[in-house]
């Protein structure tokens, strides 16, 4: 009211709004006059005199119809005073300052007592929910706030009389729909209760405006049947065109219009925008309250602050949760809203027979339902940015809008309102309610609304419209039920979200806003009626949704049952649209109905129409998925183009600022660890600066129970390969290095790397390629009559030199050139070696212990040896027993049993039995479980000999009589030749190739963007640590280690925290990864402490280790694309899978690529089997230039992209694949 606009009593006015300036007298030097003059000037008696002077209407005289020309003439004559109220105030010098606050309250109380009057018994006037209480509140608020100023606005100049036109919103020419925006929708009125039903407090007095309305009602004349009255003219208050008042007003309904005469209606129209002197005027603030002058900035500051208090609408898109409710009859034939489907991202339907939720699926819509939905939105009501906080208030405004847009009849107002306020039920209600289900109900619509109706002191935002009883008795909601008033209605404060809903609530994002879709058929409507509602802010409507999610959108569709409209399909259509990302973003940013219609057209452009033919297999629908992906790709490109065009033009659409800022920050803050700086050790310095500042958080982040579980799991995952490779390494090196050396090396290097490394999540361990190299170098030294351990010392020293040179030159960037072509060859070769070595060892067992028809007696055994005991190494003392009965068969059983148990536990991990977490635990511990089971089987068979693992007692080397913990660089038994000291640079370069490939590729896999590691990584620092520590390992006779791919990925997965707010059917997403150093230190320490379990380790048969070796070889082949393409050679083309390397490449060219890889593998196998086996890492390195230089001449870039692309992403689905399927690296 600060700008001088007098609020009209209700509905829109047919005349333009007149703003009356409030003249404020200038400040006088002395204001000591008594305040009685002001009281006399504004006395109620003076208002009564002004009103009572109105001449009474003589019913005997013929009535006259007034036109707009008469109203215009009346406004500009002396009978219609336009002087502001401030002109009647005393001169400024007679005013004095305000008395104290207590005196003002006492004077206001006396004024209340003077103006109190009993309620009128006549026809109820048009009430507004502000009243005197609201006026006093506003007056008190202005007094407490300090100062206000009215901006004078000149009234519009008089023009020629024209016929007034009334319109609300933006009516389309081609549709009778109504689109009401926030200013008008907020002020939508409601019909007040009659005076005999409205509660009156003792001592309360009506406001002057209510008294004036009552006097005007008492003077009302009989209604003329010839007079016409349009309800649209009174829907919005006139102040909606400018600054709307704080009160919500009640619209005049048909019954009240019939009770009033045409002259009264015209009189109401005329006076809504007039300046009626002395009637319902706010007090002009005294000039003494203004601290500064009229032009002083201090006086304008509070006014500017008040103008800034207007709340800005939130147009930022949120995550969505959609719920479809249909109008149904329960067992007692009472109508209620029943939830039949829901959307978080995909559709979930309630199965009618079992009342349980089905599996999430992509919603399939009929094209006709989409067209009907588009027509419904074009012709229905669209209420955008509606300022209501309760369901009754929203429902009332929706009903009134439907009446104004001629969708429903005025006499159906009560029935539609009762339908919208019916009780909501959900599938989980019956399951969770127990023996005492809660069924809140109410006696009538008025009682429900009354429970939600706050007092006027709560402010205009909380006011809820009420429904007048003078509408007459409403028609029954259902024809067969006369007691429709007693239906269960929506009641707030339900029993909250239930236990079943807690799991669903976890899957909904925190900032999600809900969409409620209400569809159904009712018997009392003649045509469908629809409304699309967007609230100005999300509100929590209790007992409406299955979960407590704030509601932002509502869609209502009611209509008769005899039409051809399928309300269920239409509700599914709007719900699917709201779950679509682009459409619900457009719904947030829509300014009118046309924006919604345009978004529907965009949705139709990206939709697929399937012809009405019978589909008898899923294979027939494969092309649909590919076509849909293509449409989505084009849709994203169009959206990206629009965003770029808007940003280039300097305009950013609402809701795009945040995404652009996030994208820009990511682009600017992204730091490529493989980018070369051009300076010596520049990459190493960057790694240290990037990673070491996070060292304190690396210790704090380990304080979580998930880290403890990861330590226990990865400990067994690291101990099993250490025992397996240690036993095989002892076999290959004739006991010079075995389990003891490998356990010590894993512990020491693991602790140092976890404390100093740039990526402490990498697990350092022994691998198959290093085992192959150790065997090749051992054979080379035996052939050249050289000491194997002394040669390893010089190889280690040269390894340190080469690593320093490589890190100084920032050579880690070369890992980008190692494509899956080389990785698959590497992994396939190592897997073949594992499988070959397993059966080769089994063949040796059958050779030493053949199946004979007759075996010698037990006395033939060597003295001092038991049947089922640990045998000494072949070089230690007497050889082990030979020709033992059942040894070969038991070894075969132990090997196959270990392999099958571990393999099927891995399959069980990816099955559908039990829960996802239970399957993961069982599958991840498959190797330890299989080892334990087979050891128990061997231990239970006491009369059959099996060769056991050789483990010394305590902290000792495997062969104490052959070596010590320190290896002399110049030789132990004889001097080491000097030429070999220099020539050791060649095997050092070869072992560097293996360490570089495995370490850098593993670090590259772990640091993928999809894994969401935030603290960064350091390729140069990690390579320097592993290479330097490998050089020290040579001095102590310990095996070289590298970053183990499978164990490192398993470690990262164990520390990954998945998001719980994932839509059912959507793929899991990573929330965070607990990047810390403590788990690596504890895992390495526990592996080191395992050396004290020598008595237990000595019980493990070597055949069990052969089974683990076979398991690692077979499982490594499953994730290699080469093995899948190899099988396609023997498969008809019609059975080929729908993979890019099949659909985008001709079959014979795909086979050519496969044969090239097989040729490389065959060449490497031949080299490995000869005396030149030491050179196989160099030949492996040659596959990199082969891929970069030769293959582009044979294949097109499009074919190479399909055949040699790194498109594997981490899979965290409970039913998905494990680490072996994701990696192209050897174990």
Curated annotation (Swiss-Prot):
This is Anion exchange protein 3. Residues 194-215, 435-448 have a biased composition (Low complexity). Belongs to the anion exchanger (TC 2.A.31) family. Keywords: Anion exchange, Antiport, Cell membrane, Glycoprotein, Ion transport, Lipoprotein, Membrane, Methylation, Palmitate, Phosphoprotein, Transmembrane, Transmembrane helix, Transport. GO terms for molecular function: bicarbonate transmembrane transporter activity; chloride:bicarbonate antiporter activity; enzyme binding. It comes from Rattus norvegicus. It is found in: Cell membrane. Residues 76-97, 104-113 have a biased composition (Basic residues).
